Curated annotation (Swiss-Prot):
Name of the molecule in the record: Apoptotic protease-activating factor 1
Organism: Canis lupus familiaris (Dog)
UniProt domain CARD: residue ranges: 1-31
Record's function text: Oligomeric Apaf-1 mediates the cytochrome c-dependent autocatalytic activation of pro-caspase 9 (Apaf-3), leading to the activation of caspase-3 and apoptosis. This activation requires ATP.
UniProt miscellaneous comment: Physiological concentrations of calcium ions negatively affect the assembly of apoptosome by inhibiting nucleotide exchange in the monomeric form.
Keyword set includes Amino-acid biosynthesis: no
A GO term for molecular function: ATP binding
Free-text comment on this protein's domains from its UniProt entry: The CARD domain mediates interaction with APIP.
Length: 50
């Protein structure tokens, strides 16, 4: 799953957060891919700004 694409990685991370696996999600947080968006240059994932 982690080799598919950036959105798969982010989706997996968000699922860990949602299901209460914050300790495991914390291990993945540093590897979250940066995805450009039109939100003023700030990238966020699941409400977390990197």
């Amino acid at each position: 799953i982690l080799k598919k694409d950036n959105y798969s990685y982010i989706s997996f991370y968000n699922a860990l957060i949602h299901e209460g696996y914050k300790d495991l999600a914390a291990l993945l947080h540093s590897g979250i891919p940066v995805i450009s968006s039109s939100n003023g240059g700030k990238d966020s994932v699941g409400g977390i700004t990197s």
